[in-house]
Amino acid sequence: MRQLNRLNQYQRLWHPSAGAPQQVTISELASRCFCSERHVRTLLRQAQEAGWLSWHARSGRGKRGELRFHVTPDSLRNTMMEEALKSGQQHNALELAQLAPEDLRSLLHPFMGGQWQNDTPTLRIPYYRSLEPLQPGFLPGRAEQHLAGQVFSGLTRFNGNSSEPTGDLAHHWEVSADGLRWHFYIRSTLHWHNGDKIETAQLRQSLTALLSQPGMGTLFRSVLRIETTHPQCLTFILHQPDYWLAHRLATYCSRLAHPDYPVVGSGPFRLSVFEPELVRLESHEQYHLGHPLLKAIEYWITPQLFDYSLGTSCRHPVQIAIGEADELASLRLVSNSTSLGFCYLTLKQSPRLSELQAKRLINIIHLSTLLHTLPLNEGLITHTEELLPGWAIPQWPDLTDVALPEALTLVYHLPVELHTMASQLKAYLARQGCELTVIFHDAKTWDGCQQLADADIMMGDRLIGEAPAYTLEQWLRCDALWPHLLSAPAFAHLQATLDAVQSQADERDRHAGLQAIFSRLMETAVLTPLFNYQYQISAPPGVNGIRLNTRGWFDFTEAWLPPPNA
């Protein structure tokens, strides 16, 4: 803050003449800087010693002295930011960057992307919003879910984009013949980010706390208890088989924090700073798997850069630019893919809405031009007719003779694309004689949504992680949507069917069972997918190892920068 005050005072001195020499009195300068004459003399002396200006006073009260400037405020700001970053004072650098968006873009350009700072390879990412606090358990945002996987470790993990779990804190595991006892063998050289050695008893304590969370208790409903059966072994004892257990433990929500320090993990990066305007990760020197190639990752929270009217390339949270978005020429698209995750529409059948009417609504969505004419940025979404690859939506005959209800209620939550979808659907149904009441739940999940009970139609999105089929099983088990969407008997039957599917030791049988469940939901017009996103990551030259993962981010441990002048 002291540097920012010095810069602001310098700008006040500079501004009246735009840097031209000035003939001015000490009294006028003090008034300009909102300070005493004594203080402005100190200010002039310090600025002159720093080489910013020259002040030639004339003897006698009220005499005009000569003020000459040697640096512009912009160059001084850049120098101050460089000095702040070299000394590890990221907060001071961000304070110095408090400018209008169009000026901020050009100012931040030299500092974003990959930089070697004090011989430390650092990657800086401008981001459009503050991040929610990190904690084990379910997290609403894609960025937070990705960060949880970089900061915390689990007993198992997904390696890259593989859908099969592999060892993490546990190097191997074994399952009893009846599927009711799972032994996880814990590595002997594990350390928390604070340097403490990880004890197996701590992992048991963290797991027990995690499973006490309501949503996590639902996910692990088959677990009877967890025991430390050896200093290097955790044993899960189940009351019914669950062959998804290793998958459940590998997902981001099952990562473990220190039982006494909830932000201390054991993943490849530790949290150094976590504040609304800055998040800094630093590599964990005692990480038990492959060490990161970067020393630090920083999120600079600069929402003003992401205003559509400014024309930045970071138009949407699924399109990440590592580096300053205004310099399109220097950024290159390094990775892109179509997400398996999707936005969806569900319909609650009731005396107000029959199955046949629900089918006609789904036909309207997929057979009309509705999805193809959404006024969204080109290349952002792709209309889909599959829930997952190979899980196609059903085809029904023309149902235009089926009368729609006179009135229906739609409730939807983020992402923002569903604003457009809701508006288009409301206008279309009005032309069909159906009045659609639209209610927006301003959140990323259905948690806490009071309007679900009265909704006929719901829209939201479903992120697909590393194991697509398993992720959908987790959705059916844990999302607040389904108890409101289905009748009590239908929901109980769904949960019993999921229990039967999870008891199949062969993964192909489990996948087939899940596909049958979702095929039934689509065939009975309860669920239909709408569109997928196009994930994109752009980076400036010299930032390497960037490869999209299933969450639309990239593994921070794989990114690297060549040394300067190499």
Task: Pin down the residues of each PLM region.
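Surface-exposed binding/hinge segments that line
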Residues: 66, 216-261, 266-275
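N-terminal lobe/hinge region of extracytoplasmic solute-binding protein
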Residues: 126-175
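Ligand-site clamp/hinge motif
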Residues: 286-328
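Periplasmic-binding protein-like
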Residues: 349-392, 518-526
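Periplasmic binding protein-like
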Residues: 433-477
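Extracytoplasmic/peripheral linker and loop segments enriched in polar/acidic and small residues
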Residues: 474-540
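Long beta-strand-rich cores associated with HINT superfamily self-processing modules
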Residues: 539-566
